[in-house]
């Protein structure tokens, strides 16, 4: 129960620009290995012009193989699903840990939202050189967002996630450290 252990022993709460928690060592070594080995296209090899969204992995026809109104999207992220969970036993255990009553009760209390009937969606994303997201608010239907970094190449900590205040002023960058991350809840 690495995530819960991290939450209990290696996490810190911050209130600016909104309540969020940073976690140190939330992933197991096996989970990290599966993330690193996930089959995800390298966006650098496709000369992509990022538009500030994640739509590149299916939205724009010019990035598809085949015809622009169909074809097969390039795979720049990988959702862990019932269909592929056998390929990701360690990440499946992370999902099970997040679904565990002790874990979701603890997070529910922290973010002040009932997670007992929520759905856990885990995805492996591959943000590479040139990637950026427009400042945005998560949709209210998303009860909680969590991003856990794997940085085995010692890339700059400045490549983490930027947080903005309500005036869209940059107030913080969560550092891009190996086996480090954050979570927060959107809206009231």
Give residue ranges: language-model regions.
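Catalytic core of non-heme Fe(II) oxygenases with the double-stranded beta-helix
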Residues: 87-188
């Amino acid at each position: 129960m690495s995530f819960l252990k991290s939450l209990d022993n290696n996490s810190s709460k911050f209130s600016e620009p909104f309540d969020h928690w940073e976690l140190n060592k939330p992933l197991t070594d096996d989970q990290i290995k599966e993330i690193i080995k996930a089959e995800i296209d390298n966006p650098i090899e496709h000369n992509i012009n990022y538009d500030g969204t994640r739509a590149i992995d299916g939205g724009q026809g010019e990035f598809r193989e085949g015809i622009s109104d169909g074809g097969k999207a390039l795979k720049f992220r990988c959702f862990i699903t019932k269909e592929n969970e056998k390929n990701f036993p360690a990440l499946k255990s992370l999902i099970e840990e997040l679904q565990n009553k002790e874990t979701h009760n603890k997070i529910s209390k922290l973010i002040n939202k009932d997670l007992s009937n929520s759905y856990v969606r885990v995805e492996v994303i591959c943000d590479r050189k040139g990637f950026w997201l427009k400042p945005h608010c998560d949709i209210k239907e998303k009860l909680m967002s969590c991003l856990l970094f794997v940085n085995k190449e010692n890339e700059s900590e400045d490549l983490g996630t930027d947080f903005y205040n309500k005036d869209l002023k940059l107030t913080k960058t969560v550092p891009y450290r190996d086996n480090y991350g954050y979570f927060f809840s959107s809206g009231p």
